[in-house]
Amino acid sequence: MGLALCGAAAQAQEKPNFLIIQCDHLTQRVVGAYGQTQGCTLPIDEVASRGVIFSNAYVGCPLSQPSRAALWSGMMPHQTNVRSNSSEPVNTRLPENVPTLGSLFSESGYEAVHFGKTHDMGSLRGFKHKEPVAKPFTDPEFPVNNDSFLDVGTCEDAVAYLSNPPKEPFICIADFQNPHNICGFIGENAGVHTDRPISGPLPELPDNFDVEDWSNIPTPVQYICCSHRRMTQAAHWNEENYRHYIAAFQHYTKMVSKQVDSVLKALYSTPAGRNTIVVIMADHGDGMASHRMVTKHISFYDEMTNVPFIFAGPGIKQQKKPVDHLLTQPTLDLLPTLCDLAGIAVPAEKAGISLAPTLRGEKQKKSHPYVVSEWHSEYEYVTTPGRMVRGPRYKYTHYLEGNGEELYDMKKDPGERKNLAKDPKYSKILAEHRALLDDYITRSKDDYRSLKVDADPRCRNHTPGYPSHEGPGAREILKRK
């Protein structure tokens, strides 16, 4: 769908404008506002310093298409029936009668525009989308691919729009690919290899790089190296390879941060910027070498599920420190929060919670007792459904394959290194979190218990653990269904 850009000068307006900046793969673990010191996200950190950042923000699925389809519709993946990255008919497009963020705003007098990555299965309905034009370039140190080329076009389109905004209130999404280019970096450095030299020191490995006991984590997580092509390619990396991976991730993050800076400067170059609420977020995170993981796949560790969620602008009361006493779910909460701030009624069927009271500095009377993330499959080569329940202190995960479970004390063990699910001392807490999962399944009409596992035995035939990986991965040995 084409986008006719408005050329009228912005005027003062009662309703706030909204600029949503989303960066694919952006984990909290690289954002300065969340305590990181690499200096990768200075423009994002500046926005955060003026507003509110939520620490415990968890996505509905640590995979692009299910997460995005859920985000823009305010529904969970089992409700949208977009459960993987596959196209139709494996996944179905969101029905036309389902209210979306774009439809609610466009029907309320807003100009709703979207630039950049979609991967939405119809959930961006209501937004006018402009497809970015890829602008190739070269990089002296790190491989760049179409992800980075498309971001150049996305940035140019968003800057052009925000430099000359419409008269009516607008909601604009600048949807960047990076740091997703990290996936291409893995492909360029697959298997045992010698890394290209880079300028500057290599980053250190995270404290939770090593897995202490492969036998004490669920089967699907033990064998991600068989299920996910990028994990197959990285299975036999040495520690220096992983450090180069982190350096590359930081590099792609700095690239997109510069583009975020350009978009923000365009926004604030006109009077409309003073009346615009900025939201910065991500569809999911990245392993960042934690648990020897790269990119994201069958796991719910915080590096993959805990994302930046930042608000700043008119009516948003600056917080001196991150909001860490609330569990938030951008997947469900973004839609009602923005509708509340814009004075738009939220459909009764939407399960999210408006965070507007917290953003205004008021008491948050309604909050989540727990939040959930879901997993089904990436491209149906291996299907291993799972669920995560994150409570105020503990994180519980369950996988249908092997009835696998994890329980982590997120206060004592934020790196999720010691699985307590089999520890008798935690049997009561485990039972409580099993009950929370049952509550979610019942309340949200989740079909989780009826789903089927499909994992070829050839993807489970070596000693558990990525360094022990043997043979090709599922993508190479199985035909797509």
UniProtKB/Swiss-Prot annotation:
Residues 472-481 have a biased composition (Basic and acidic residues). The modification 3-oxoalanine (Ser) is found at S64. The conversion to 3-oxoalanine (also known as C-formylglycine, FGly), of a serine or cysteine residue in prokaryotes and of a cysteine residue in eukaryotes, is critical for catalytic activity. It is an enzyme of class 3 (hydrolase). Residues 453-481 are annotated as: Disordered. Pfam families: Sulfatase (PF00884). Disulfide bonds: none annotated. Its cofactor is Zn(2+). InterPro entries: Alkaline_phosphatase_core_sf (IPR017850), GAG-degrading_sulfatase (IPR051849), Sulfatase_N (IPR000917). One of its GO terms (molecular function) is arylsulfatase activity. Zn(2+) binds at C225, C226, H462, H469. Keywords: Hydrolase, Metal-binding, Zinc. It comes from the Bacteria. Its EC number is 3.1.6.-. Exosulfatase involved in the degradation of the glycosaminoglycans (GAGs) chondroitin sulfate (CS), dermatan sulfate (DS) and heparan sulfate (HS). 2-O-sulfatase active on unsaturated non-reducing end hexuronate units. Has a slight preference for HS-derived structures. GAG-specific sulfatases play a key role in the persistence of the major human gut symbiont B.thetaiotaomicron in the host gastrointestinal tract. Belongs to the sulfatase family. This is Delta 4,5-hexuronate-2-O-sulfatase. It comes from Bacteroides thetaiotaomicron (strain ATCC 29148 / DSM 2079 / JCM 5827 / CCUG 10774 / NCTC 10582 / VPI-5482 / E50).
